[in-house]
């Protein structure tokens, strides 16, 4: 198997169908495989019979995004793993060929971070009107989870997607481990994905509060796991979020302290995963730009 396309899904069967339908015509199933993990979602299970060419993994209860990715990626057989969100699809018909070519030409690149265009459009042609014609490629500090590629052999020398993160922040953890192993992350707009999200709707459904709490907790865990001396970083993180968010909004305030409580409770279970990165590598990583998103 040459390439594995991997998707974790929860509560978005309609979006997943769009993605699978977009992918089907772009694949050679003799050398490409699609694996989908259903994270505790009964209404998505009806798609299993409809898409027999997909390799399905199903959890009766939700285990959350990062642990689900950890389980799913262990099942993949391709030499290259391509990760997509369930509501994201590639706009390039030759996205697999481009990924293979870049990995062949650049042996020190472990991850390709694809260009992301957010929004809901009438057609892929409309999306592509927003794409820049100028080639943009540079080494960066991490990747965005809605669209990326990683070499299987590189993924397997890391701990994979962390089981100590639930959702939001798992890409930063995998990026850290890949960079610490001496591989690079290349941002490239040769491959573009349309991330079909409605920003205004997500804000109206208050997903920002949910994300705030998860990111505060998981960023704390990130520092505790990877930094030799994390307390200063954590203190700055707490103070910044207290001033900017918790003091400005009652719901942010409650979410802030709920996250702190969750951190304290989980701390004994986090200790076995501690894997400090040396200071030289951390400094090098801190000098890298973020990918465009």
Q: Positions of the model-derived regions?
A:
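Glycine-rich, basic loop-to-helix element that forms the pyrophosphate-binding segment
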Residues: 59-76
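Conserved donor NDP-sugar-binding/catalytic core segment of glycosyltransferases
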Residues: 89-124
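Short aromatic/hydrophobic "clamp" motif used to bind/position activated sugar donors
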Residues: 81
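Acidic donor-binding segment of Leloir-type glycosyltransferases
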Residues: 20-58
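A recurrent flexible, glycine/aromatic-enriched loop bordering the glycosyltransferase active site
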Residues: 118-120, 133-150, 166-167, 172
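A short, conserved alpha-helix in the catalytic core of glycosyltransferases
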Residues: 148-150, 154-159, 164-192
């Amino acid at each position: 198997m040459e390439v594995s396309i991997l998707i974790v899904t929860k509560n978005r069967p309609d979006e997943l169908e769009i993605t699978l339908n977009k992918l089907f015509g772009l694949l050679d199933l003799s050398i490409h495989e699609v694996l989908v993990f259903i994270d505790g979602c009964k209404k998505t299970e009806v798609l299993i019979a409809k898409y027999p060419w997909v390799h399905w993994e199903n959890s009766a209860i939700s285990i959350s995004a990062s642990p689900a990715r950890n389980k799913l990626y262990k099942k993949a057989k391709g030499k290259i793993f391509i990760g997509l969100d369930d509501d994201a699809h590639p706009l390039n018909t030759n996205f697999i060929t481009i990924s293979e070519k870049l990995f062949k030409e650049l042996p020190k690149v472990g991850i390709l971070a694809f260009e992301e265009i957010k929004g809901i459009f009438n057609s892929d042609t409309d999306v592509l009107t927003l794409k820049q014609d100028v080639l943009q490629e540079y080494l960066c500090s991490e990747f965005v989870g809605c669209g990326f590629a990683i070499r299987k052999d590189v993924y397997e020398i890391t701990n994979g997607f962390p089981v100590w993160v639930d959702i939001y922040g798992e890409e930063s953890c995998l990026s850290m481990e890949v960079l610490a192993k001496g591989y690079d992350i290349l941002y490239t707009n040769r491959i573009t994905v349309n991330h079909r999200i409605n920003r205004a709707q997500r804000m109206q459904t208050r997903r920002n509060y949910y994300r705030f709490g998860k990111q505060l907790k998981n960023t704390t865990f990130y520092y505790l796991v990877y930094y030799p001396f994390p307390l200063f970083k954590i203190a700055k993180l707490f103070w910044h979020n207290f001033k900017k968010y918790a003091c400005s909004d009652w719901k942010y305030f409650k979410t802030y302290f709920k996250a702190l409580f969750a951190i304290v409770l989980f701390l004994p279970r986090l200790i076995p995963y501690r894997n400090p990165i040396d200071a030289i590598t951390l400094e090098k990583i801190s000098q890298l730009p973020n990918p465009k998103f």
